[in-house]
Regions:
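Charged, compositionally biased N-terminal leader segments and the immediate start
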Residues: 1-25
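Primarily NTPase-proximal linker/entry elements flanking Walker-type ATP/GTP-binding cores
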Residues: 17-138, 145-165, 171-190
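G-domain G4 guanine-recognition motif of GTPases
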Residues: 138, 192-193, 227-231, 252-260
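Phosphate-binding/switch loop-helix module in NTP-utilizing enzymes
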Residues: 169, 173-215
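GTPase G-domain guanine-specificity segment
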Residues: 204, 241-245, 257-271
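Inter-motif core of Ras-like GTPase G domains
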Residues: 207-229
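Conserved beta-strand/loop subsegment of P-loop NTPase cores
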Residues: 221-227, 247-257, 274
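Single conserved hydrophobic/aromatic residue that forms the stacking wall/gate
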Residues: 273-280
Length: 280
């Protein structure tokens, strides 16, 4: 199943909400300035973002909507085309492909976004594709996080490298990579803490893990994936910017898209950070 088939399923609630909202707004056959402004306001309220909403409004204003046709359907088609043009270049088709050499993926994100569950699901795909996988339990600040990752490793048959709660997370990452090298295992997924005593400590620890990884392999981490919760709205833009300042984010995973009618935030993220690939 490709990225847009998955979006179709996860985006259904948002798509239904947008279609319903457009039907409420568009009561005239001609799209005048007042209607355009209402469409823009509605898109902003759906978490599409100010800049992307303004661009969509401008695109609609330049299109000639046939008054004989259903205006809602016409605008829905414009939105679909816009989203496709925005996101197709960002799809990471190579992310789940088998690798010939060691591949270390650092998974980041704040608590509650579904990081550990996401790691488990990614690990299962790697296993199903024939790759052995190591989980590195670097969220040592929460015993529950280690236990949850261990549960996933048991479930899918992955190897887990862990330590006692409170241990140095970077040392756990180092041991995981060394174990991978010594046993010719090519996939390492590193779980990280989502919340420490303050934001500076969180970012310092995240950077430390990345630096230690690089010492074991100059090309690592090969991917730094940020997990974002779609229900968090525009706040995820700030999360992305904060993490990207510390370690360059190479991919995004959006969770809980099926749990919100305001999934437009994925459009906002894609528009704001066109250089960042998205992983479904």
């Amino acid at each position: 199943m490709g990225i847009f088939e998955k979006f179709k399923l996860g985006f259904k609630k948002s798509a239904d909400n947008i279609s319903s909202g457009l039907r409420d707004i568009i009561v005239k056959k001609e799209i005048d300035d007042e209607t355009l402004n209402k469409i823009e306001e509605f898109l902003i309220s759906s978490d599409v973002g100010i800049d992307a909403s303004a661009e969509i409004k401008n695109i609609i204003s330049q299109k000639k909507i046939d008054p004989k046709k259903n205006a809602v359907e016409e605008i829905n088609a414009i939105l679909k085309e816009y989203i496709l043009e925005l996101m197709v270049p960002l799809e990471r088709k190579d992310f789940f492909e088998n690798k010939e050499n060691l591949n270390v993926t650092l998974i980041s994100g704040v608590n509650g976004v579904g990081k550990t569950t996401t790691i488990g699901k990614i690990g299962k795909i790697f296993k199903d594709n024939g790759s052995e996988v190591i989980f590195s339990a670097c969220d040592t600040f929460r015993a529950a996080a280690i236990e949850q990752l261990e549960s996933w490793s048991d479930k899918i048959g992955a190897i887990i490298i862990k330590s006692n709660p409170g241990s140095d997370p970077a040392s756990v990452a180092y041991k995981a990579i060394e174990h991978a090298k010594n046993n010719n295992i090519r996939r390492v997924l590193i779980d990280t803490a989502g919340r420490l005593q303050n934001k500076k400590n969180l970012m310092d620890e995240f950077k430390k893990i990345a630096n230690v990884i690089k010492k074991t392999d100059e090309s690592a981490p090969h991917d730094v994936v940020l997990v974002l919760d779609a229900t968090s709205g525009q706040n995820i833009i700030n999360q992305l910017e904060e993490f990207d300042k510390i370690v360059k984010i190479t991919g995004l995973i959006m969770t809980k898209l099926d749990g919100t009618a305001k999934g437009g935030v994925l459009i906002a993220v894609s528009y704001t950070h066109l250089t960042l690939p998205t992983t479904p």
